[in-house]
From Swiss-Prot:
This is Fe/S biogenesis protein NfuA. Changing C39S: No effect on activity in vivo. Still able to bind a Fe/S cluster in vitro. The gene is nfuA. Keywords: 4Fe-4S, Iron, Iron-sulfur, Metal-binding, Stress response. Its cofactor is [4Fe-4S] cluster. GO terms for cellular component: cytosol. [4Fe-4S] cluster binds at C149, C152.
Length: 191
């Protein structure tokens, strides 16, 4: 479910040494499955452990996950990274905003999941997003851009060189992608 690197475990163990005996960590998601989902880590004293929690035992600590957060923390990674600027704890949870779909789920669900978990986070850096409107009978994913992507002069490159390549690589049953957006250049446009 969650991978915690050795460096992160050592960091947590150091912090836990200063807490009440038996205190561990809790990993959670607030607003799971929504665009506003946020992940966090907190101390979990022994009296805060719930019967429905999942206990994930690691070499140096135990991480508790509540029942509601568990499916959204699938494939999550916690690391403690040190570089020239200092050190920081990172928590990557690709499924926090949308629950991972099964490999045998309908194509529409699998494409939507990839858009939300992999492509939209990249577009968000420019204030943009893309939505799946439909998949045609002849195998084309019909997309609609919004935010900074609407009217952006680079949208064709983003569509063909970025999104289409990723989708066709992941879903060979697709023939291509088409843009349904009526692009209107404005102050919201990124380029």
């Amino acid at each position: 479910m969650i991978r915690i690197s050795d460096a992160a475990q050592a960091h947590f163990a150091k912090l836990l040494a200063n807490q009440e005996e038996g205190t561990q960590i809790r990993v959670f998601v607030i607003n799971p499955g929504t665009p506003n989902a946020e992940c966090g880590v907190s101390y979990c004293p022994p009296d805060a452990v719930e019967a429905t929690d999942t206990a994930l035992k690691f070499d140096l600590l135990t991480a508790y996950v509540d029942e509601l957060s568990a499916p959204y923390l699938e494939d999550a990674e916690i690391d403690f990274v040190t570089d020239q600027l200092g050190s920081q704890l990172t928590l990557k949870a690709p499924n926090a905003k949308m629950r991972k779909v099964a490999d045998d789920a309908p194509l529409m669900e699998r494409v939507e999941y990839m858009l939300q978990s992999q492509i939209n986070p990249q577009l968000a850096g420019h204030g943009g997003r893309v939505s799946l409107m439909e998949i045609t009978e002849d195998g084309y994913a019909i997309l609609q851009f919004g935010g900074g992507c609407n009217g952006c002069s680079m949208v064709d490159v983003t569509l063909k060189e970025g999104i289409e390549k990723q989708l066709l690589n992941e879903f060979p049953e697709l023939k291509g992608v088409r843009d349904l957006t009526e692009h209107q250049r404005g102050e919201h446009s990124y380029y």
